[in-house]
Amino acid sequence: MKIYQIDTSARKEGSTSRALAKKLLDKIKKPEDEVVYRDLNDEMIFISNLTESGMKIPEGEQTEQHKKMFELSDKLVLELKESDIIIISVPIYNFGPPATLKAWADLAARVKETFKYNEDGSRVGLLHDKQVYLVITSGGTKINSKEDFLTPWLKHVLNFFGIKNIKIIAADQMALDYEKSIKEAEEQINKIS
């Protein structure tokens, strides 16, 4: 099995989402499994007019800048396609996703790679048979509350890619009771078989 772990917290040290994702990885990883790790903060991932316009230009007419942007997009798409299990650790920042995760989703959303258009214009995801674990943390936002815009958005993006098997491990409202939130998240991890 290939496990794809994506960390999104801007905090390299002292990140609760990263620490919980590591515990989850240690719990589910078998000795023969391969782990592909991506820290979205290691590269400045962003979407620009160059990226968007480049998606509409035939490959032979793209500039070197277009090609460089697509190298990263191609790599992200391949990592998704080749994975069996995906772990995404993500804190809620101001009710939504970190900017790097939004950019990752934009770069991974590629026609004929992660989704396609049907003749009637509807879209269908192309990535199936994948298990996703979302390790979500927050200071004050309750997961799945009306002020949580991260969780429904991220589930929608993954469904758009064709990924339906999604489990959430939540350590939310840590500012209210940090120890309780961590304990509950660790219990969720321990229940995974």
Q: Predicted regions: what is each one?
A:
Residues 10-12, 139-142, 173-176:
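Short histidine/acidic/glycine/proline-rich micro-motifs that form metal-
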Residues 68-152:
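Helix-loop-strand module that forms the ligand-binding subsite of alpha/beta enzymes
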Residues 144-193:
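Glycine-rich phosphate/pyrophosphate-binding loop and the adjoining helix
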Residues 38, 135, 169:
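Hydrophobic residues at beta-strand termini and immediately following loops
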Residues 29-31, 127-130, 161:
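A short, structured loop/turn motif at beta-sheet edges
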Residues 2, 34, 130-132, 164-165:
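Residues at the starts of beta-strands that form the adenosine-phosphate
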Residues 46, 122-123, 165:
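Glycine-rich, flexible loop/turn motifs
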